[in-house]
Amino acid sequence: MTYYLFNPENDMALALGQKHYNPPKNIVRFSEDLSMLPLWYAKTGDCVLIRQEVPDNWLQAERDQLQIGVSWLPLEQYWRKSDAADFLFPWGWSYTVYNEWRKKGKSKQWMDCEMIRNLSGRNWVCDVLAIPYIKESVLPAGFVYPQILKSYESVSSFVLQQQEAVLKAPWSSSGKGLYWADGTLTPSLKHWVMNVLEQQGFVMGEMKCDKVLDFAMEFTCEEHTCSFLGYSFFITENGKYKGNWLESDDTMERYLETYVDRCRLVEVQHLLQQFFTQHVVGYYQGCLGVDMMIIRQAGAYYLHPCVEINLRMNMGVVAHSIYEKYICKKSHGRFYVTSYATHDELVAFHAQMIEANPLIFEDGTVKSGYMNLTYIGEQTMSMAYIMVES
């Protein structure tokens, strides 16, 4: 049996590089609220480990309609079980989760956590963008390639050379660890840079692109191979993740073709598979996503084939799985993750959405309507949900 665990704090555990990491209360709360999320990508017969009590009949009618055969078990009960897990599928791997599972005899898997941390650094973007085909045939002339900056002086020089730039910490949680610079040196910039240099050793410097669209290519690494899973289109607000499209790969690829040639997308996909087979396979098994953009430069559109690499499960794969398994192929929609200031606000939103968007099924799939994907308890402040229309 495979046991699934939603541990979004893993990104910060990797960033700090510590063998033991205690996340802040807001991250603990978020991981508890969304701990049922793996239900939607786990396989029949497997089990989701949760950090809260969820009634056995939660979403019973919906799960019956969708024929979901996945169980769940509170993490504390799991620790008391005598048998070791056949296979652990966490949201992400780090020293923290690996050491905890091994120490308690709950995982027989071997992971090179130091290598996984190295492979999770943003500096790997430089290696991908240096692939000859990408450098010569994909990116526009005048594109400023990301730079690894190891001193405040080198960061200052980079910022002054660019009208607008984005500085990134090598490791951070998604959408975090960014500093937007406007070509001037300020005390806050220096403080941020010095802090990142002290903790992580270098800063990534990148040009600010004229972004048209965010999307990703999703892959899965197995023991000997790397396979292409599909596309994901994601929605951001001020750099913060909000949700994903629920669409077919064909629909998303046709949309991308309005900006760039399909042959270019396919060639980049194949090159990334080769890159990950060479550098990642053998050290990591699981999902990974490559964040990309359609950018505009001098009135033309270009593919930015590697903004960031997420060496872990990600919301794009979740949305892709939901569409493939549970959404009527005549329908489309959106997958959202959202947080509220109070529990009452979340409950009011949930009640309003249920009333305004009744759930309709067709042939064991969702045809239209609203459905929450995570359990809403007495103190829940974050949730995942879908909105589908035909």
Q: Can you annotate each of these PLM segments?
A:
Residues E198-F202, M207, Y241-Y302, S339-V366:
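A long amphipathic alpha-helix within ATP-dependent nucleotide-binding catalytic cores
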Residues F219-Q274, N310-V337:
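ATP-dependent carboxylate/phosphate-activation module, predominantly the ATP-grasp catalytic core
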Residues C328-S390:
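Peripheral (often C-terminal) accessory segments that flank ATP-dependent C-N-forming ligase machineries
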Residues M1-L39, T44:
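N-terminal-proximal low-complexity accessory segments that begin disordered
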Residues V212, I235-N238, R264-L272, L303, ...:
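Charge-biased, low-complexity intrinsically disordered regions
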Residues Q163, S188-G243, M293-C306:
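Phosphate-binding site of ATP-dependent enzymes
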Residues Y145-P146, E164-L189, A216, G239-L256:
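Glycine-rich phosphate-binding loop of ATP-grasp-fold ATP-dependent ligases
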Residues I27-Y41, L49-S154:
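Conserved N-proximal alpha/beta basic substrate-recognition cap immediately N-terminal to
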